[in-house]
Amino acid sequence: MTKLVNEMILVLDFGSQYNQLITRRIREFGVYSELHPHTLTAEEIKKMNPKGIILSGGPNSVYDEGSFRCDEKIFELDIPVLGICYGMQLMTHYLGGKVEAASQREYGKANIHIEGEPDLFKDLPNEQVVWMSHGDLVVEVPEGFTVDATSHHCPNSAMSKKDKKWYGVQFHPEVRHSEYGNDLLKNFVFGVCECVGEWSMENFIEIEMQKIRETVGDKQVLCALSGGVDSSVVAVLIHKAIGDQLTCIFVDHGLLRKGEAEGVMKTFSEGFNMNVIKVDAKDRFLNKLKGVSDPEQKRKIIGNEFIYVFDDEAEKLKGIDFLAQGTLYTDIIESGTATAQTIKSHHNVGGLPEDMQFELIEPLNTLFKDEVRALGTELGIPDEIVWRQPFPGPGLGIRVLGEVTEEKLEIVRESDAILREEIAKADLEKDIWQYFTVLPDIRSVGVMGDARTYDYTIGIRAVTSIDGMTSDWARIPWDVLEKISTRIVNEVKHINRVVYDITSKPPATIEWE
């Protein structure tokens, strides 16, 4: 850890798709936190000098062959440890308690009763609702532990060994359905680990600028600039750190939103006085995508082609050693880790070719989207960029379902522009996390001008969210939806039907592909 971080909570990853929320919650308290693989050794952890360790949840049973484990010597480090769900079971298993398969798997809300006045539940109600998600449970706590909470199906819902500062909870405090989950985590972070809470985006900027300078030295960096908030923040942060050692490459792959290419060049080459090279690669990308309809294959093709374009440009520039990308925590999470299943590959993660010529710099890969926006504001980036709609690296290539053609791209481009205009007119931009149109590869019968039509359907996707890990469909007023639908059908060629996606995440992802 860099010396600019005085206190840190370490989270060990045992495979839950949502264990990164633990890290996020702790950062919200003003305490720096990082997620690392469960394979870290006790010696490595000791060098990191965390104020506390959290063992995350995960899908395994402690008795499964090949189940995820951690170094048992963690419990000899004299550092407070909190085990969550599988983390509690693993702690129990290592310290001599007993874990068994539950007679009934427990998923969802549960009521727990607090016993006595345990540290984790200080100043919290004796009865509270928590979120359970487990198939095994602790049937016998290790010697010296006390039972701190019970529930109907889980008699040992929480446990502790106060003198060692070891704690376990069978439920998930990081999930918002646990009504006092944040308070419990605060009690661990501030009460048990004695953190102060002085970490901020200002600290993050100092830390990352120092890391960038140490990594890059006097070498040159290429930044993959798209004009979206992620790559914009990366570009400004790196430019602030190393100045003219940064060259931004903006690839117009023909998969951008309406007016986006012109806007990017104006904003960054003029507004931020950066060296920006525009590459017109539309034909190159569309030729590669010809005949391809599988979404994963499209993502991989676009990711690969991006890197090859940069390779070509770097060769022209000479002496480029690093490639900067706006990869976020959520990109890495959804692309899968050694412990988490892949949901879908992100072009910043899963689409990288093995023969890549650059070393990657990804200064945002520990941040969630809302943290990136806060960072952008701290860096002085204008609101119109900081609050720009999230836009995937593969662009409209994954908003055209099935094979990508110029005609289909134009349909999505025009319909999306109408959607954005009407959302802006209704002053809903900051109320909705993300909104866009998609073109499913389906046609339906319609009637326009007394004539039968057989044309495409446009889908509208709009969601509310905090960090992109989970989301709900946005309740856009009906009159606004009516205007959007009417304009799209009347102004966009080959569209005779508009539908609104009312699915949350999970079970759906925000993007359709």
From Swiss-Prot:
InterPro entries: Class_I_gatase-like (IPR029062), GATASE (IPR017926), GMP_synth_C (IPR001674), GMP_synth_GATase (IPR004739), GMP_synthase (IPR022955), GMPS_ATP_PPase_dom (IPR025777), NAD/GMP_synthase (IPR022310), Rossmann-like_a/b/a_fold (IPR014729). Pathway: Purine metabolism; GMP biosynthesis; GMP from XMP (L-Gln route): step 1/1. It holds the Pfam family GMP_synt_C. The active site is at C85 (nucleophile), H172, E174. It catalyses: XMP + L-glutamine + ATP + H2O = GMP + L-glutamate + AMP + diphosphate + 2 H(+). GO terms for molecular function: ATP binding; GMP synthase activity. Keywords: ATP-binding, Glutamine amidotransferase, GMP biosynthesis, Ligase, Nucleotide-binding, Purine biosynthesis. Transmembrane segments: none annotated. Residues 8-198 form the Glutamine amidotransferase type-1 domain. Homodimer. This is GMP synthase [glutamine-hydrolyzing]. It comes from Bacillus licheniformis (strain ATCC 14580 / DSM 13 / JCM 2505 / CCUG 7422 / NBRC 12200 / NCIMB 9375 / NCTC 10341 / NRRL NRS-1264 / Gibson 46).
